[in-house]
Amino acid sequence: SFPVPVPARGIHCLVLDEDVAVYETVKELLGANHHVLWRTTVASALAVIASQHIAILVTELQVGDGDSSVMLKTLKQEYPDVLTIVNTSFKDTLRVSQLINQAQVFRYLPKPLRKGLLAKSLESTLTRYKQLQDVPALKVASKVEVSQDVQEKALSSKIMDYLSRLRAKGFGGGVVVQAV
């Protein structure tokens, strides 16, 4: 069942992981009709998100410049139609359940990466993305509330400010960036 069947027009998928094999597997599964971008830090991922319409984010929770959890929660506030697949070796069930509830993580996949499971997850994620595009009310329902945790609120505010500054500098104009 490779590559994964997807909507007629190409989408942008961002892989945030230090492991190039994850990027290469996602790129192989989505095929040539879609844009798969790869970043290894939260900061560089935010630059891509500010410049591209990202449909799917495949991410590890711990990356080069820290924890991506707050970024995931913040992105869901600003970009409710971005669907996230978390692929991680972390087994902290409280943290995972918080991400599912607060950041609306669409799929959680344990590492090591299993290609068949990732393929099925990408397929269901693309189906859900198409539903979000076809029914605008679903996008509104997908938006999450701002975190009440003081530290998360402060970091979330910094992330939102960073995204705004990137857009103001012209990163919102559709520049395609392929790799690190």
Each language-model region and where it sits:
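C-terminal output helix
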Residues: 113-122, 126, 130
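Two-component/phosphorelay signaling modules centered on CheY-like receiver
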Residues: 19-38, 42-44
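Conserved phosphotransfer cores of two-component systems
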Residues: 50-52, 75-81, 102-103
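Alpha4 helix (beta4-alpha4-beta5 surface) of REC/receiver domains from two-component response regulators
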Residues: 69-70, 91-108
